[in-house]
Each structure stands twice: as C-alpha cells, then as structure tokens.
Amino acid sequence: MELQQKTKTDTNGLIPPYGGELKNLIIKDKNLKNDLISKATYEFECSERNACDVELLMVGAFSPLEGFMDENNYNSVIKNNRNTNGLLFGLPIVFDSNNEKVKAGETILLTYKKQKIALLEVSSKWEPEKSLEAKLCYGTNSLDHPAVKMIFNERGRFYIGGRVYGFELPILSLIHI
C-alpha cells in the first residue's frame, strides 16, 4: 500500500507557495520608491522585531500576505487560526506602535537604524485585547511564557494593519545568545 501523497508542482518542479502565489513586495523602480517615500505621513523607527517581520513580508516568507494583518484578519487568526480568506495562520502578523495620532488612510515610512526599509499604507489601527491574544495564541497569560511576555512588555499599545511596499532589506544585527 502506497501512502505517499502526490503534491501539485509548478513548471519548475517546485511546490506552489502557501496561498498559491509568492508575494515579493520589494519595489525595484527608484522613481516609484521616491514617490512613495515623498507621500509618507509619518516616519517610524522599527524595533528589531518589527524590522524582522517587515523583511519576512518583503521576501514573501509570509505569502500570501501583502502587509500586516488588519483588525478583521487579526481577530480571525487569534480566534480561528485562519485569516478571513480561510488560510491557516497560527499567529497574527502585526505591526505595533504607541503612536496615538496615525489613522487609516495615512502612510508610514518604516526605518530601521535610519535605513528606509518600507512604506506601510495604513488600512486599520486598533487597540488589541492582549490578554485574549495571549490566551488564544499561547494558551496562557503567564509572563513566564516568553511570547506572552513579549506581547505585554515589548509590543506597543496599538496594532496597525496595511499594505507594505519594500525598499531595501533591513540590515539586522545577529541574534544574541
């Protein structure tokens, strides 16, 4: 009895990316990049964690996402482990901030160590119920759990969702052990 399941492949012999399409969000056109930068309403310096997530979005590692999850997708993921399109996502992909002024419809130039890495078109901003997120995603609210500790102690007050346009990959430091 053969138990091996055949997987659909593309013409190159590779399995298709999750969600069916690899999302490369890096803008190569310098004029378009400069135009997007000039339209930024705000400039935010990313934490290392946010910069890592921006990089993962830019290179398609979070495909089929084209940016940070909006409030509807966030709620769907923490409650159902699926985005609003029904695709499995175990954890929400969010950008956090303490900025009270930014609102939907505005754009944020994302920098990391002064490097212009991306533009975020804000489609959604909300104040998450972090205790619910911790409980549903990690099964606990205990700060002994490193991810719960990160949610409560490192993430900003607000989550911001929206489309990301990548400019250049952030130059990240090595993880300290």
Can you say where each PLM-predicted feature lies in the sequence?
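Short conserved beta-strand and strand-loop elements enriched in small hydrophobics
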Residues: 105-113
